[in-house]
Amino acid sequence: MSFRSVFLALVIAFALILAAFLLNRARPKIETEQPTADLVRASGKCAECHARTQYSVVHEYEMSAHARKGINCLECHQPAPGQEKKDHHGFVISTKLTAGNCRGCHDGIYQQFLRSRHAAPAWAAIYGEKGLSPEQVNFSETYQPGGTRRPPHPFVQLEGGSAMTSGCEKCHSVGKPNPDGTIGNCTDCHTRHTSSVRIARLPSTCAQCHMGPDHSQIEIYEESKHGIIFQAQAHLLNLDAPPKTLTTRDMFVPTCATCHMSGINGVGITHDPSERLSYYLANAITEKRPNYAAAQAKMKQVCSQCHTPALIDRVYSQAEQVVQATNDRVRSAQDLMNGLRKDGVLNSPPFSQPIDFVYFDLWHYDGRTSKHGAFMGGADFVQWHGNYPMLQKTVELRSMAAELRRQHGKAK
């Protein structure tokens, strides 16, 4: 064999080896990093196709804890009982995943979620009992009295279906009843395919819904010292830390999840964000929750990971004073409105007269904001976004009420 033939054979062999190497590197990581044949069959085949049509799905999955633990696509997309089945390139899957798919591995977390206001009460705040079974309503009422057994909100009829579907539902569907008998969708907080605790711990995740004039928690958080320090030091936090071993070394600055859900330094994990709340701050007149003492003790235990008992007690005492003062203002406005109805001055449907909107804004916007600001360290929201506009609307209500009475010949 001539030198030229040997050289040509070596070049061809090298080219083939290089091509094989480059082709292998181009394959999705999930095909090359997972060891079992079943995993390659399920996830590898899915990734091979979806990498061409929906690369972001494959990329997000590659970064997930599910991928690291060897959980394949089929294990999540396997139809749960009661779900619609679809034949998809040789696999029987469900494309409309719900909490029913997640509960197969995370049933304890799902049960905690069911007890929360994120579950059925979130949906019922818009649509009442629509779509919920009697058993689901009864279960929810056990833990959240009055949260589910209620009529649809007046805005459903007044604003129409499109406003609900593209507006309110985008947040309140976290508690939507599913055809498979489950409630909710875990991806509202954890996102699809990434299924990330990092994303769930970010304030911006909660801010998808907890923002705006009627529930301005993210705006209050960003003004607070907690929010300011988070913005400065977020890059130093271990947002990927395993939930069961989370400590203040990982999260030395709290996010929403740290205070309301995380287990930290031995404090128990919960997927019921109301478990540590001692008041119904969203209500017009705020009352203590049935588990007031236990809930407050749990939240104070979280606070104590960074703060002294004296400071914690002082903050709670001051916040409770704001709650009582806000209740007094709202109750005065309620009495005014009830008096108008009793005297036949105000007998039209809800939200049909300007005074209805002024009263609603007083408690639903300003009252809530004042109370949340007091508990979350947002001074400006207690005053200029809370008490000041409440005072302004109180004067406006009295003026409007007097004019209505004059028009009806029932002036006082």
Stretches with model-predicted labels:
Residues 2-412:
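Short sequence/structural segments immediately N-terminal
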